[in-house]
């Protein structure tokens, strides 16, 4: 049975709604540091909303579901969590999931029920659209996931067809790397983002000396793969995958081989757990995140400071904490409009879905944005980070290690594909 944690929706300094309770949930891998820090953002948003009186007189009850099994995300666990929410009529929507492979499994069961899903972190483009050439075509299709039902899925982050190319451009042009070895973890996310990286890197004139893949269940030693990259002349390594698939352990093993070249990846490695996995070889790790860094967004300073006061733990703030905060607020705003549609009563899931689809000009901490008909955000920003030593982790713009607490992902740059 998947773990569920219920939060009694109060926050100091105000009175919650008195008309009753509306539930929202989340489906995240809270067994991981990244998953828990994302859940923190949702709880913070709900606490703030209830402290201000709730949503049109209703208290919002937030329940966090864990989709981990054996220390990693599980699509099967995610499906069970969504089924639990669907079975309780008080749930009107959810934040999540965290991983694209989980979304692929959840959309087909949530869509017929008009159940709103808003992901703070899914980046595989095929969840919402077809990928144009020269990138590899989708192996599954957004329309098939919805099976003729109205769209019920949105995300506040941009997609890997931007994220992969962003790191390819940064490695080629800024780090002056012209040959790389590419490794992916065989997941929906890992295969997709590494393929997008490949295409862009080659288009710039770079060489992918080898592209290898592995599966977590059967792999604990990457040295043979890494030696293949090294001997083929790779000047850097790009990895497509996530920390819970052990994608950052190869970085540690590079040190064992005496091979010191930059190690880049997507948002799946911009995590505390990745820094821990690199274990003594943290410097030289680069990562992208599929959105603006909230600490760099004008007007977000007060919200970030308030969050850190409420959640003061060293690893409570993560790469997608503020995206989750935005997603929760977008959902609660749609619920509020749906309450109006229901003449002040509890709305149906379809009323909430219809209002979510009308979201325009949403003002969040990561920017002001719309959603298109597919559920994608109008923001097309990719942030780039590097692991560096910092004097005060609390002032870091990224996430930090646990054991190596002063080694953090530090914001370096961003690419805005909406304006380029």
Positions of predicted regions on the chain:
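Extracytoplasmic "Venus flytrap"
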Residues: 18-21, 25-43, 65-75, 98-99, ...
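Solvent-exposed loop/turn segments at secondary-structure junctions
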Residues: 29-33, 67-71, 99-104, 122-127, ...
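Sec-exported extracytoplasmic/periplasmic mature domains
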Residues: 43-54, 83-91, 107-115, 122, ...
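Extracytoplasmic ligand/sensor domains, especially the bilobed periplasmic-binding protein
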Residues: 91-212, 262-287
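Segments of small-molecule ligand-sensing domains
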Residues: 307-321, 332-399
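Extracellular/periplasmic periplasmic-binding protein-like sensory domains
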Residues: 158, 251-327, 337-342, 409-418
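Beta-alpha junction/loop-to-helix N-cap segments that form part of ligand/metal-binding clefts
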Residues: 10-19, 34-40, 52-140, 156, ...
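Short, low-complexity disordered leader/linker segments with a strong preference
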Residues: 1-23, 51, 411-420
């Amino acid at each position: 049975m998947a773990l569920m944690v219920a939060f009694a929706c109060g926050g100091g300094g105000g009175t919650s709604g008195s008309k009753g309770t509306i539930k929202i949930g989340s489906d995240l891998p809270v067994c991981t540091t990244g998953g828990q820090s994302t859940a923190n953002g949702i709880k913070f948003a709900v606490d703030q909303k209830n402290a201000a009186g709730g949503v049109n007189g209703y208290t919002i009850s937030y329940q966090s579901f864990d989709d981990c099994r054996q220390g990693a995300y599980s699509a099967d666990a995610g499906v069970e969590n969504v089924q639990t929410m669907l079975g309780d009529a008080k749930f009107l929507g959810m934040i999540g999931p965290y991983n694209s492979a989980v979304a692929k499994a959840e959309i087909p069961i949530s869509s017929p029920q008009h159940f709103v899903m808003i992901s703070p972190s899914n980046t595989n483009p095929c969840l919402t659209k077809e990928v144009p050439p020269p990138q590899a075509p989708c192996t599954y299709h957004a329309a098939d996931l919805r099976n003729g039902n109205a769209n019920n899925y949105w995300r506040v982050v941009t997609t890997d067809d931007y994220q992969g190319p962003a790191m390819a451009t940064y490695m080629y042009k800024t780090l002056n790397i012209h040959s790389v070895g590419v490794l992916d973890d065989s997941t929906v996310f890992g295969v997709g983002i590494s393929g997008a990286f490949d295409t862009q890197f080659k288009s710039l004139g770079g060489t992918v000396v080898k592209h290898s893949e592995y599966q977590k269940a059967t792999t604990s030693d990457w040295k043979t793969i890494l030696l293949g990259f090294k001997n083929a002349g790779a000047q850097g390594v790009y990895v497509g995958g996530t920390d819970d698939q052990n994608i950052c352990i190869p970085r540690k093993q590079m040190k064992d081989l005496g091979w010191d070249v930059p190690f880049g990846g997507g948002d799946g490695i911009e995590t505390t757990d990745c820094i821990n996995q690199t274990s003594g070889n943290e410097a030289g790790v680069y990562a992208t995140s599929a959105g603006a860094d909230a600490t760099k967004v004008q007007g977000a300073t007060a919200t970030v400071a308030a969050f850190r006061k409420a959640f003061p733990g060293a690893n409570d703030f993560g790469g997608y904490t503020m995206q989750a905060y935005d997603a929760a607020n977008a959902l609660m705003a749609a619920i509020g409009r749906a309450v109006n549609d229901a003449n002040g009563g509890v709305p149906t899931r379809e009323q909430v879905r219809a209002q979510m689809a009308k979201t325009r000009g949403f003002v969040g901490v990561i920017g002001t944005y719309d959603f298109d008909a597919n559920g994608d955000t109008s923001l097309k920003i990719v942030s780039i980070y590097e692991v560096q030593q910092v004097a005060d982790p609390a002032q870091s713009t990224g996430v930090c290690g646990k054991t190596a607490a002063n080694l953090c992902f530090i914001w370096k740059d961003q690419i805005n594909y909406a304006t380029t």
